[in-house]
Amino acid sequence: MTKGTQAFGKKHVKSHTLCKRCGKSSFHIQKKRCASCGYQDAKKRTYNWGAKSIRRRTTGTGRTRHLRDVNARFRNGFRGTTPKPRAQPTN
């Protein structure tokens, strides 16, 4: 048996699978931790040396459905869903 380059060709077992949080195939099956987002930890894994990675994943890069709704409500002064009752004309 050799311990060098030839032995690495025999590796065929998957060590990583899909992550529930980020969807990448970076969730380590034995460690139960995602190498990309750090899933199982409460906070998302980010490092400042990965500035490009932060730029790709940050708020505003996806649908931002909730934030668009918040912005629309902000422009209208956070009014409720029901319109204000019209003032009755006084006679």
From Swiss-Prot:
Cofactor: Zn(2+)
Listed GO CC annotations: cytosolic large ribosomal subunit
Binding sites annotated in the UniProt record for Zn(2+): C19, C22, C34, C37
ZnF (C4-type) intervals: 19-37
PROSITE patterns: RIBOSOMAL_L37E (PS01077)
InterPro entries in the cross-refs: Ribosomal_eL37, Ribosomal_eL37/eL43, Ribosomal_eL37_CS, Ribosomal_zn-bd
Entry keyword set: Metal-binding, Ribonucleoprotein, Ribosomal protein, RNA-binding, rRNA-binding, Zinc, Zinc-finger
UniProt key word Chaperone: no
Cofactor note: Binds 1 zinc ion per subunit.
Keyword Cytoplasm in annotation: no
A biological process from GO: translation
GO molecular function, one term: structural constituent of ribosome
Top-level division of the source organism's lineage: Eukaryota
Family note: Belongs to the eukaryotic ribosomal protein eL37 family.
PANTHER family in UniProt: 60S RIBOSOMAL PROTEIN L37, RIBOSOMAL PROTEIN L37
Function: Binds to the 23S rRNA.
Protein name (record): Large ribosomal subunit protein eL37
Gene: rpl-37.2
